[in-house]
């Protein structure tokens, strides 16, 4: 009889322990989701505020705000070798250089498609080299992750070119902004 009460007592303890474990796991996972969502919403709010600062601001401006008649697109070669003022003086139209160091064909095609969706520039100067088509970087879209949910061209390119596990990770807002922070 003593053995029997021990067995029934251990089942009760086991059920309570399993319930406690389940509740703890649920609370931890819920906390992670809430923190991820809160940080993501904060970063979504902050990104347009820095649209005039640094490389991240330049990318945001390129995707959403640029509206000059002449747009210069490319990687670091276009970024450093095209002087916007000289292009404006020789063509007689305002120009903006959206080229960014380390951003090659896949990145630039998202930028150009976003620009063409908003308006039709009179001239797009697109600097490409052979090595830009076969970029050696592991992830050509890392600078575009923050725009995964908000830009249809970025979303389509990431889903088309990257493995499924990479864009599955982009469901996390913190992961999207990891390249920016």
Q: How would you name each of these model-derived features?
A:
Residues 41-61, 66:
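Alpha-helical transmembrane signal-anchor/signal-peptide segments
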Residues 20-41:
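Hydrophobic membrane-insertion alpha-helices, especially the h-region
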Residues 38-50, 94-102:
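Acidic/glycine-enriched edge-of-secondary-structure segments
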Residues 73, 77-162:
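Membrane-embedded segments
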Residues 1-19:
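N-terminal Lys/Arg-rich, disordered targeting/topogenic segments
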Residues 66-67, 120:
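Residue-level preference for short coil/turn positions at secondary-structure junctions
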Residues 158-181:
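Extended, charge-rich helix/loop segments that form flexible
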């Amino acid at each position: 009889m003593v053995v029997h009460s021990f067995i029934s007592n251990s089942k009760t303890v086991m059920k309570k322990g399993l319930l406690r474990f389940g509740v703890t796991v649920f609370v931890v996972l819920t906390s992670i989701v809430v923190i991820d969502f809160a940080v993501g919403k904060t970063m979504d709010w902050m990104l347009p505020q820095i649209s005039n600062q640094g490389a991240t601001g330049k990318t945001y401006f390129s995707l959403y705000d640029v509206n000059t008649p002449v747009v210069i697109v490319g990687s670091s070669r276009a970024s450093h070798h095209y002087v916007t003022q000289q292009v404006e003086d020789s063509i007689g139209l305002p120009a903006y250089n959206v080229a960014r160091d380390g951003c090659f064909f896949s990145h630039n095609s998202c930028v150009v498609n976003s620009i063409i969706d908003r308006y039709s520039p009179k001239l797009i100067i697109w600097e490409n080299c052979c090595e830009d088509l076969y970029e050696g970087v592991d992830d050509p879209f890392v600078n575009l992750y923050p725009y995964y949910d908000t830009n249809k061209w970025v979303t389509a390119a990431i889903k088309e070119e990257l493995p499924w596990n990479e864009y599955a990770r982009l469901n996390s807002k913190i992961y999207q902004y990891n390249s920016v922070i």
